[in-house]
UniProtKB/Swiss-Prot annotation:
Pathway: Cofactor biosynthesis; biotin biosynthesis; biotin from 7,8-diaminononanoate: step 2/2
Name by which UniProt lists this protein: Biotin synthase
Residues annotated as binding [4Fe-4S] cluster: C72, C76, C79
Highest taxon of the lineage: Bacteria
Protein species of origin: Xanthobacter autotrophicus (strain ATCC BAA-1158 / Py2)
Biological role: Catalyzes the conversion of dethiobiotin (DTB) to biotin by the insertion of a sulfur atom into dethiobiotin via a radical-based mechanism.
Domain Radical SAM core per the UniProt entry, residue ranges: 57-285
Cofactor(s) needed for function: [4Fe-4S] cluster; [2Fe-2S] cluster
Cofactor note: Binds 1 [4Fe-4S] cluster. The cluster is coordinated with 3 cysteines and an exchangeable S-adenosyl-L-methionine.
Length: 345
């Protein structure tokens, strides 16, 4: 098929780019062909697909709180919270339920519609899960969506989280299968996928994405998205993180961050591969210009974290985000992700 710009694409790639179907059988060649499109064509296709499924003037706002910081047994090379690295981060115990709910109320007052809680564990202990479930129930009672990231889960733990009312479980795949052993050695990609399968089987929505700028190749970045886009069904939420440089981590000094245009291409590809997923412009926004973020929204990103801290790294202040939204004519989404669907969907 030849587009109006003279670009030739495969039939399956063109159909998906037109937003006519959801696919979980993407190939590497198809994804690469989309990524390599002339930038104006790529942006046009991504925005066109985005408009078929979402209100293009609406962006979800979420707040992320570290409820248990540091001391993690995993050796993720990008993470300040690993006990294997000397990053100067002091480990803390699990926060109390009331303290967490107080922070959730502040997040709601600041305009957040989803409250995400992260604990630096390889996997949670059952005794700690009691407190986390109480946090989830309290967050839900405020009218916020609840999301947690706790590490690997057993099916029984998934059931307990679901009973507490959990909306989303975050469990990032980090990077491509090929590059994964370069970043993490204490777990495998299959371990991550097994937990995602358990969460899906338990009826909880998936929030799973990855990190770029850790020294991986463009092919690795595309392969990471392909892992997500070949899940059936697709994850409901896909966070894309730009790695924040953290002294003391093994990745420090090896990072090779994509330039702004390359990063925007990745956002556009995520939108084309997973048309109905929320695509979150996640960590790393603090170093992005307003213009770069605007291009990401145009490419199909429709979620951000608000608040000046993401777990242990910086994030733009709420006032700065509000000013950017005002300049772009963007408004915050309603609490439920389904409210973001366009009237035509």
């Amino acid at each position: 098929m030849t587009t109006s710009t003279g670009t030739t694409t495969g039939t399956g790639t063109a159909r998906a780019a037109e937003g006519s179907l959801l696919r979980s059988d993407w190939t590497e060649a198809e994804a690469r062909a989309l990524y390599d499109l002339p930038f104006p064509e790529l942006m046009f296709r991504a925005q066109s697909v985005h408009r078929r499924h979402f209100d293009p003037t609406t962006v979800e706002t979420a707040t992320l709180l570290s409820i248990k910081t540091g001391g993690c047994a995993e050796d993720c090379g990008y993470c300040s919270q690993s006990a294997h690295h000397e990053t100067g981060l002091k480990a803390t115990k699990l926060m109390g339920v009331e303290e967490v709910l107080s922070q959730a109320q502040k997040a709601k007052d600041g305009g957040a519609t989803r409250f995400c809680m992260g604990a630096a564990w390889r996997s949670p202990k059952d005794r700690d899960l009691d407190a986390v479930c109480a946090m989830i129930s309290g967050v839900k009672a405020m009218g916020l969506e609840a999301c947690v990231t706790l590490g690997m889960l057993t099916p029984d733990q998934v059931t307990r989280l679901g009973a507490a009312g959990l909306d989303y479980y975050n469990h990032n795949i980090d990077t491509s299968p090929a590059f994964y052993p370069e970043i993490v050695t204490t777990r495998t990609m299959d371990d991550r996928l097994d937990t995602l399968a358990s969460v899906r089987a338990g009826g909880i929505r998936l929030c799973t994405g990855g990190i770029v700028g850790m020294g991986e190749s463009v092919d690795d970045r595309i392969a990471m998205l392909l892992v997500l886009a070949t899940l059936d069904p697709h994850p409901e939420s896909v966070p894309i993180n730009m790695w924040n440089e953290i002294e003391g981590t093994p990745v420090m000094g090896k990072a090779d961050k994509p330039d702004p245009i390359a990063f925007v291409r990745l956002i556009a590809l995520a939108r084309l591969l997973m048309p109905q997923s929320i695509v979150r412009l996640s960590a790393g926004r603090d170093a992005m210009s307003d213009e770069m973020q605007a291009l990401c929204f145009l490419a199909g990103a429709n979620s951000i974290f608000t608040g000046d801290v993401l777990l242990t790294t910086a994030n733009p202040e709420r006032d700065k985000d509000a000013a950017l939204f005002a300049r772009l004519g963007i408004r915050a989404a309603a609490p439920a992700a389904t409210e973001m669907r366009s009237a035509a969907e």
